[in-house]
Amino acid sequence: HVRFLYAKGSVYRIENNNLLFHGAVPLDENGEFARVEYGGETFSGRAWMDKCERMARQGYFAPVGSDARRRGRDFLYYLWCGPLSPIFGRDRMASFEHLFVDGEFPERKNPYYAYIENEDEAVARGTARRIFAEFGLDFETGHIVNGHIPVRAASGEQPVKAGGKLIVIDGGFCKAYHQRTGIAGYTLVSSSRGLSLRSHGPFESTQKAILDNLDILSTKDVFEPSGKRVYVEDTDAAVRISCSFQRDPRRTPLRLRKRFRASGRIRNRPFRSPQQIPRPSNPPRLRSS
């Protein structure tokens, strides 16, 4: 499972001029990119998220027993609950207090959320514009796709914010959030005709679904139709397919690939043991003449 996460996941992803990430791009109280000092260097914005990506991969792929692997593993704990972690997005984790101590123990969110979700659309869009510029994306056609903070749909909160530039797709898939959110999560669908959101009703139990003939109900909301139909040749996938014909990564020396993987500069494919490789149920047999 961990190898699959490293092979398919990342701290952030850019796809078809959309910026996808789980938590936040850490900001300071003034709405500027938070400056983080680590290892004698100062990082902010995209550079900080790239550093987090490299350290996370270093903690898993660096040689066993090496200082690089130890530092990377320590850094994974910071990503989990650090105040300027782009995955955590809060000033502290108060899970222990919530579980064992009566009272309120607020976890203050990073200023990113106050700016990007600001009721003043000019402030929210201005923040989105700076983030798009930081990642080299076009503001007019792009979106930020965010998770982490459940959308309280039952209270009228909308998942599309900042004048359509921010899409929050965490609708509370976890059962513990259903009462708070009123739904069981969102699915963002990007098709050739535009973007749409599907909100899902909670699934109570298999027994109730069978006895009452219930299904998971989903509602669809097309919020940004495409001006013209998008074809495969217009996507980032087409660029990757084109590049694969021009160069074969398998020709990269094995020694160099292992070094890049250990430092977190390239992703590792998910491991599949021989038992996991699908085989035909009735393999053809060779006849001897």
What are these regions (language model features)?
Residues H1-S289:
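Feature recognizes metal-dependent phosphohydrolase scaffolds
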